[in-house]
Amino acid sequence: MLKPERMVRVSVVGPREKLGETADLLHRLNLVHIEEPEESEYFRIGEPHPDASVVSRALVQMRSFISHLKLDPSRIVPRRKFRESEIEAQLKEKLDEYQQLIGERIEYLRSVDEKIASLQEQLNQIEPLKRLGIPARLLKGYKTLRVFVGFVKENPTEKFAQVTSDFEVFATEYEKELVVAVFVKAEYGDEFLRILQECGYREIQVPDVEDFEAKISEIEKEIESLKSRKEQVEKEIEEVKVKEAETLLAIEEYLSSQMDKYELPLRTLVSKYSFVLVGYLPAKALNEFKAKMDANGVAVEVLDEEGEPPTKLSNPAGVRNFELLTTTFGIPKYKEIDPTVFIAIFFPIFFGMMLGDIGYGLLVTVISLYLKRVFKTEGWQRMLNIGVYAGVMSIIFGFIYGECFGPFIVPGEYEPYQIHFIGSQLEHLYEFHHGHPIFDRVEEMGVKILLFATIVIGIAKILFGFALGFYNVYVEHGLKDAILEKLSWIIGVLGLAMIIFGFAYNVGVFYQLGMGPNPGDVPPLPLPGLMEGWQAGLNVYYLAALPLLVVWFILFVMGEVPKMGAMGVILAVELLTWFGQIMSYARLLAIGLSSVYIAFVINFIGMKLIDPVGISIPIVGAIVLLIGHVGNLILGILDPGLQSLRLHYVEFFTKFFEGGGRLYEPFGRIKRFIEE
């Protein structure tokens, strides 16, 4: 779970005449991640199966049909699986049938669309001319006159007048543009054309039409007729889709599988008599794989690793959903720790801490469960499962905080029923806790405690990240590099933590938690003699920070100076970055409080509008509550989700996770519509 699944590198060697059978078996087993081959003196990359081009054309044809029909395999649950022999027997017949039922109709629809576009273009030419009110026969056919008809961005009349007064301009507006017809003696034609071009002239070709009105009516009727026929053909295609969807997808899956197998020689080295391919497979499947290959007359040999093996993530079902978030950031290298389990634990907790509302959490859960029924692809299913986990954690934290569409207890002289539309019911729910939340994050003490808790979480998470980084570097480069690169920062962050705890000790956080003395009895500086009263007690946290920071600096210099020289010492300021990242965890409090106060304001305004004692506008109040909480819910999903991701990607992953691996992609496919 913490490491990708162990892989072994194998070679598969056999007689060349068995390559086809081996391709079938490899595809069926769906185990071997095949490596790209490198040619040698005696082995060359093979050639695809002779039928590959035929299958390729058929596959392109089927995918074209499926694309046009907008068939989504992930959203179709097959009523039965088709046997491969059944598909093979009727393949030619079905391809011809679908070409007639779908292909020819698609071509017809394309021709109809082209005709409609052509007719629409004619309309676009004729309608502006109709607006001018000049018959087509008067707009062309002159020997001594030049006629210009088209669109312009500005009226050119004044510019024409500077050339000659012997011209006529007819102009009118059409769809926010100016349409003009210009008549001028031929001798001024070139000059007028230049002026028109300066005015943004776009010519309109004048068609041979006697009556614009009649022609427009004729074209519109023809367009309507074509659209009607198009709708009829689309209905016919839809009927084929409903009836043949599963068969279409089964044939596409069969052809895709055949294409994979026919192209396997391109990933295989062949000689005159034999073939060899190299790849990786899970170590636990090696014995079974060898047995099946031996039975097929093909040898399997385990090879030494070369380069980086592919990564096959190995996580339990619940954790597997969060692989989506891990691989979005990067794919773990083969020998790296897989951080998926940590993001599976902490992402929902952080989301719940920030949103922390029973009502919002319930909506997130219900919406995610509903969308799982709509979006069936693996990616959507995983993301929506994460939404369910996050929603459940929000409900749990919401119960702890005592919030359901906002708080029902706030500082001030307000009764729950005055500030919340179900305030009385919530107060009754918490009778076991004297009508108050288990933990109130709105009141002053709750804010201080939660702020301190988030900083402690930040310290622990960053230290844990560096500990994982220590392991990764130790595995890759050895103990010395791990100590200089990661242990040094663990010690440095511990020093920072002592300073933060010392400050909290001084300002009385521990005192308020019942874990320390009154801050008035604690000197702000750790060294005796610097101020009166030091004998009352020393701040042990500051004292502990000093040796930790000294040890950190020594290890840091030992690690950086050999690599970068004296300039490497300057990088010690990076310790302040870790301080900023520790404080960044305070967003677990800040984001949540912003959502709480927005919900409080929405409820307060809504209840004031509904309250019969004041200005009673119940409908407006209900609208305020509805729109306000919908908007706050959207913010409550986006902000905690993004901020929780950021705390993992930036503050946590960067301490140990390099990424850059490549996913395990075995040769073969999981078949949903066909079976052997």
Swiss-Prot record:
<keyword id="KW-0472">Membrane</keyword>
<dbReference type="GO" id="GO:0005886">
    <property type="term" value="C:plasma membrane"/>
</dbReference>
<feature type="transmembrane region" description="Helical">
    <location>
        <begin position="490"/>
        <end position="510"/>
    </location>
</feature>
<keyword id="KW-1133">Transmembrane helix</keyword>
<dbReference type="Pfam" id="PF01496">
    <property type="entry name" value="V_ATPase_I"/>
</dbReference>
<keyword id="KW-0813">Transport</keyword>
<protein>
    <recommendedName>
        <fullName>A-type ATP synthase subunit I</fullName>
    </recommendedName>
</protein>
<comment type="function">
    <text>Component of the A-type ATP synthase that produces ATP from ADP in the presence of a proton gradient across the membrane.</text>
</comment>
<feature type="transmembrane region" description="Helical">
    <location>
        <begin position="449"/>
        <end position="469"/>
    </location>
</feature>
<keyword id="KW-0406">Ion transport</keyword>
<dbReference type="GO" id="GO:0033179">
    <property type="term" value="C:proton-transporting V-type ATPase, V0 domain"/>
</dbReference>
<keyword id="KW-0812">Transmembrane</keyword>
<dbReference type="GO" id="GO:0051117">
    <property type="term" value="F:ATPase binding"/>
</dbReference>
<feature type="transmembrane region" description="Helical">
    <location>
        <begin position="617"/>
        <end position="637"/>
    </location>
</feature>
<dbReference type="GO" id="GO:0046961">
    <property type="term" value="F:proton-transporting ATPase activity, rotational mechanism"/>
</dbReference>
<keyword id="KW-0375">Hydrogen ion transport</keyword>
<dbReference type="InterPro" id="IPR002490">
    <property type="entry name" value="V-ATPase_116kDa_su"/>
</dbReference>
<comment type="similarity">
    <text>Belongs to the V-ATPase 116 kDa subunit family.</text>
</comment>
<feature type="transmembrane region" description="Helical">
    <location>
        <begin position="341"/>
        <end position="361"/>
    </location>
</feature>
<keyword id="KW-1003">Cell membrane</keyword>
<dbReference type="GO" id="GO:0016471">
    <property type="term" value="C:vacuolar proton-transporting V-type ATPase complex"/>
</dbReference>
<feature type="transmembrane region" description="Helical">
    <location>
        <begin position="564"/>
        <end position="584"/>
    </location>
</feature>
<feature type="transmembrane region" description="Helical">
    <location>
        <begin position="590"/>
        <end position="610"/>
    </location>
</feature>
<feature type="transmembrane region" description="Helical">
    <location>
        <begin position="390"/>
        <end position="410"/>
    </location>
</feature>
<dbReference type="GO" id="GO:0007035">
    <property type="term" value="P:vacuolar acidification"/>
</dbReference>
<feature type="transmembrane region" description="Helical">
    <location>
        <begin position="538"/>
        <end position="558"/>
    </location>
</feature>
<comment type="subunit">
    <text>Has multiple subunits with at least A(3), B(3), C, D, E, F, H, I and proteolipid K(x).</text>
</comment>
